[in-house]
From Swiss-Prot:
Described function: Catalyzes the formation of 4-diphosphocytidyl-2-C-methyl-D-erythritol from CTP and 2-C-methyl-D-erythritol 4-phosphate (MEP).
EC number: 2.7.7.60
Segment forming the signal sequence: none
Keyword terms, alphabetized: Isoprene biosynthesis, Nucleotidyltransferase, Transferase
NCBIfam families reported for this sequence: ispD
Species of provenance: Deinococcus geothermalis (strain DSM 11300 / CIP 105573 / AG-3a)
Database matches in InterPro entries: IspD (IPR001228), IspD/TarI (IPR034683), IspD/TarI_cytidylyltransf_bact (IPR050088), ISPD_synthase_CS (IPR018294), Nucleotide-diphossugar_trans (IPR029044)
Protein known as: 2-C-methyl-D-erythritol 4-phosphate cytidylyltransferase
Domain of life: Bacteria
The keyword rRNA processing belongs to this UniProt entry's keyword annotation: no
Length: 227
């Protein structure tokens, strides 16, 4: 583990990877390969140097590939349920929740998140929105949405584990479903720090994303972004 002097206690990376990958159309997305390595393997490799343990929630019938420095648990039927199970599978003080489908994670983003979470208890990687945004109605341009102050949220997201457990417990008690953990913190009226992310942290969701990932991997693997 790479030393992070501003954090006390243990740190764990939690990767909910039990999704079916329907939009990509190639089975469970975490096991799809980019330049000879699965999305999951790339995400684990990017996180492992910064944490004390890596935990992965996998779909039933899909064991953890050999050689990965991680432990696996059975994921839930939703991402939210998988994260809930992962939170109970560790005793770490701080957790980094990361999508396996974001395989290109620069170390600088991780260190910035860990520094921020030591101050605020919750932080997420994010990028200011650069594109023009419009609201559509039945396939037609309706209203322009001002992009000033808008951020596109990425992962990893970093939390004090006790705080994220509290947020998840509140959501479960109220039957509230979410696809984002930082949003559960904000829902309680608590602050979430926005940490500058990286354009390479895009999520592989569609065949077009996969083609882009193949192109990025050629450069990424040659430069070998490392702590």
């Amino acid at each position: 583990m790479t030393s992070v002097c501003f954090l006390a206690g243990r740190t764990a990376a939690l990767i909910p990877a039990a999704g079916s990958g329907t939009r990509l159309g190639r089975g469970p997305k975490a096991f799809v390969e980019v330049a000879g390595q699965s999305l999951l393997a790339r995400s684990v490799a990017a996180l492992a140097p910064w944490v004390d343990e890596v935990l992965v929630a996998l779909p039933e019938g899909f064991p953890l590939p050999p050689g990965l420095p991680a432990q696996a648990i059975l994921g839930g039927t939703t991402r939210q349920e998988s994260v809930w199970r992962l939170l109970h599978a560790t005793t770490a003080d701080v957790v980094l929740v990361h999508d396996a489908a974001r395989p290109f994670l620069p170390g600088a983003v991780v260190t910035a998140l860990l520094e921020a979470v030591s101050e605020t208890g919750a932080a997420t990687a994010a990028l200011p929105v650069a594109d023009t945004l419009v609201r559509g109605e039945r396939g037609r341009w309706a209203d322009l949405v001002p992009r000033e102050g808008l951020w596109a949220v990425q992962t990893p997201q970093a939390f004090r584990r006790a705080l994220l457990l509290r947020a998840h417990a509140a959501a479960r008690a109220e039957g509230f479903g979410a696809t984002d953990d930082a949003g559960l913190i904000a829902r309680l009226g608590l602050p979430v720090r926005l940490v500058p992310g990286d354009a390479r942290l895009f999520k592989v969701t569609t065949p077009g994303d996969l083609a882009l990932a193949q192109a990025v991997a050629a450069v990424w693997d040659a430069t070998c972004d490392a702590p």
